[in-house]
Design a protein with these regions (language model features):
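Bacterial N-terminal signal peptides that target proteins for export
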Residues: 1-7, 60, 110
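Solvent-exposed loop/turn segments connecting transmembrane beta-strands
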Residues: 46-55, 78-90, 115-123, 154-156, ...
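Feature captures outer-membrane beta-barrel proteins of Gram-negative bacteria and organelles
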Residues: 29-31, 53-66, 88-102, 123-140, ...
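Outer-membrane beta-barrel initiation region
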Residues: 19-87, 259-283
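Short acidic, gly/pro-rich beta-turn/loop elements at beta-sheet edges
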Residues: 67-69, 85, 104, 119-121, ...
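Flexible, glycine-rich linker and terminal segments associated
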Residues: 21-36, 144-177, 183-188, 200-283
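Transmembrane beta-strand segments that form the barrel wall of outer-membrane beta-barrel proteins
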Residues: 39-47, 69-81, 105-116, 125, ...
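Classical Sec-dependent N-terminal signal peptides that target proteins to the secretory pathway
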Residues: 2-20
């Protein structure tokens, strides 16, 4: 609970500061200069109870427009801790998104390749659907044949995850989500779990994800985590500074602005270590 209390206090300070918008906008402008081209760019800090912080940069860029949507690419680079050792992970993906005839909903498909500095390689296929209030994502992950992690005693695990998010009534700037995952163990039992949390848009360029990761696996601790994200361009709509709305749900809106948002997936590769009673973090 101390972790949650500290995170909430920090969030309150960030959004109550009279300079919050200016500070987050300056950070957003710096982020936009990190990766060339128009599109979505994000950098984040991932804070966890039982592990050192992770840092990442992610970008989404449009490849081509279509009559009903677009083709896009998403790529990211970040550090993470596995088996008490830091490593770097890169992701590269391509996808297609389609708008409904009235443009109030969006669906999409995507494919990714993930690679880390221990020569572990993985591919994934995903689908997504969203409107102004609800969002659904499903991803399947599988080790690539040319993954060399086995040579250093590591095994990439196949698996899947499902995520359903909904706007919180009267809080147009916050979503509640449930994210279930399953990883197929090789020399040990499978790993399953559920994340329960919330996404809160603190300012137009700053978001906080706060969740509890309930892991159904002995040897892997349940934990709270907080992910602070800075992004560019600024998002339209309500932020935490607007408080409680008079209306319960967001009105239906044109989803064209969502065509270059990031794909919700597990960018970190799930690893099983040989000769270790623990598997690893589940993200």
């Amino acid at each position: 609970m101390r972790f949650i209390t500290k995170t909430l206090i920090l969030s309150f300070i960030l959004i109550s500061n009279s300079y919050a918008d200016g500070i987050s906008e300056k950070i957003g402008n710096l982020i936009s200069e990190m990766v060339p081209g128009e599109g979505y760019t994000e950098t984040s800090i991932d804070l966890r109870e039982n592990n050192s912080p992770d840092f990442s940069i992610l970008a989404v860029r449009e490849i081509a427009k279509t009559d009903d949507g677009n083709f896009f690419t998403q790529f990211s680079l970040f550090n993470t801790e596995k088996n008490s050792s830091d490593r770097w992970v890169g992701n590269l993906g391509f996808g297609k998104r389609m708008l409904s005839d009235d443009k109030t909903s969006m669906t999409g498909i995507n494919a990714f390749i993930d690679y880390d500095t221990k020569s572990n390689a993985r591919a994934s296929l995903g689908v997504e659907a969203k409107n102004a209030v609800l969002e659904f994502n499903a991803n399947y992950y599988e080790e690539l044949p040319n993954s060399f992690g086995n040579e250093v005693g590591e095994k990439v695990l196949d698996g899947y995850d499902l995520r359903l998010a909904s706007q919180i009534p009267y809080l147009h700037w916050a979503n509640a989500f449930v994210n279930s995952y399953h990883w197929d163990g090789v020399d040990r039992d499978d790993v399953e779990g559920i994340k329960l949390g919330t996404d809160m848009l603190l300012t137009s360029t700053m978001n906080l994800e706060l969740a509890f990761d309930d892991k159904d696996k002995e040897g892997i601790e349940d934990e709270w985590y907080a992910k602070l994200q800075f992004f560019y361009p600024p998002r339209e709509g309500a932020t935490a500074q607007d408080g409680i709305s008079d209306t319960k749900w967001k009105e239906e809106k044109d989803m064209t602005g969502q065509l270059l948002t990031k794909v919700k997936r597990q960018n970190k590769i799930m690893i099983e270590f040989k000769g270790n009673s623990k598997i690893t973090r589940t993200d």
